[in-house]
Amino acid sequence: MKKLQLVLFLVLVIIFGMLFFVKKDNSNNVDLSKPEVAGESILAGLKVSYLDIGQGDASLIEFPSGEQMLVDCAIDGRILEALGRVMPYYDHDIDYLLITHPDLDHYGGCTEILKRFDVKNIIYNGLEKRGDAMWEAFWQALQEENANYIEIDKEEVWQIASTTMHILYPDHSIKQNKNIPGTSSEVNANDTSIVFKLSYLDKSLLFMGDAEEPLEEYLLTTYGEQLDADVIKLGHHGSDSSSSEELLTMTSPTDSVA
């Protein structure tokens, strides 16, 4: 019995030693191998958690500096439970809240986020849905938050910590004209989504919001090979209306997330 206990003890020592060695590896080479926890992309010091909340969409980006960006808030207060699985209970700050577009399954939980967290920057595409009670409540909560409000109305490149965030769309004021440039057909809210590419070291992630094929075609024409990415967050939850063969060929991702 004592020999068995000794063997088990030695096995545990070896396992913990290996874990310690892995954690102490400070190499700058980005590793896109499958993470230990499903629903995450881990690129050295950059971590993206794709939150499992049933209906809706939400992702938490944790930058190498420790700053955090929440991309969309799902449909309701379940976002708080989902964040509780990836954030410390004592963390009441979110540096950036980015709402890609005003579909309820993307902004519905934002009012709960604004009640629970101190949000420093709010990023939005500017599309208004006056007369919609849910959107009106969301908009009122945004106005009451003491945060820096950023409305995306042009292509921009931001530096956050040591990452580059290239905002690809909207590249014009959605308030003035929500249609895709060069087209006259009316678009729904999905094709007003904020689309951005996040690059860190030699790897990149492309976030498509709810972009459907008409917006994908415009992005392909406008940006071409700039859309190439290692990981793509598929548009419109991976539905048939998005992620055309042309887009996937151009982006040539190693991994995709619906």
Model-assigned labels for residue ranges:
Residues 2-258:
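Non-globular, low-confidence helical/coil segments that flank catalytic cores
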